[in-house]
């Protein structure tokens, strides 16, 4: 499968998906992931407009951009264009997380690793324990090779 095309910069001041997608792109992707079957632009718009005032044409434009970025598939079903995600939310999160980490590690591996440990220690000690477990497991795996 061809990977999606994400922007080359992360928006550190944004939350969740909006770190790697635009704000409206993130809302559209969330709406698509919440549908269990291919959805029309109107159906996606109806989900978004409840919480975010936006025109249908704007949603159509964003859907087309997400198709170009290989995040969505577009197909004609019963004469209507319908959209589905190319990846599950979990698959996308894993891909985007890896891309973010690869980009950040290009800055300064040692400082990034130390900062990650410090931030987890301050904000989520359980996640720090999980990171420690993952590191130990990976080191054992590498020694066996």
Question: What is the meaning of each model-derived region?
Answer:
Residues 38-48:
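Short acidic, hydrophobic short linear motifs in intrinsically disordered regions
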Residues 70:
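Glycine-centered, phosphate/nucleic-acid-interacting loop/turn motifs that mediate DNA/RNA or nucleotide
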Residues 95-140:
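Amphipathic alpha-helical dimerization/coiled-coil segments
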Residues 60-64:
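Short, hydrophobic-biased segments on the C-terminal half of alpha helices
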Residues 21-24, 77-96:
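Short, cationic-aromatic polyanion-contact patches
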């Amino acid at each position: 499968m061809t990977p999606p095309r994400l922007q080359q910069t992360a928006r550190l001041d944004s939350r969740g998906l909006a770190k790697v997608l635009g704000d409206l792109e993130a809302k559209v992707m969330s709406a698509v992931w919440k549908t269990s079957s291919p959805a029309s632009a109107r159906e996606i718009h109806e989900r978004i407009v409840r919480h975010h005032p936006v025109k249908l044409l704007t949603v159509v434009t964003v859907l087309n951009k997400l198709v170009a970025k290989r995040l969505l598939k577009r197909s004609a079903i019963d004469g209507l264009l319908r959209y589905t995600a190319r990846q599950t939310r979990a698959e996308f999160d894993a891909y985007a997380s890896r891309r973010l980490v690869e980009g950040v590690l290009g800055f300064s591996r040692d400082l990034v690793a130390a900062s990650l440990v410090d931030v987890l220690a301050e904000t989520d000690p359980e996640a720090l324990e999980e990171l420690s477990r993952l590191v130990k497991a990976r080191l054992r795996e590498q020694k066996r090779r």
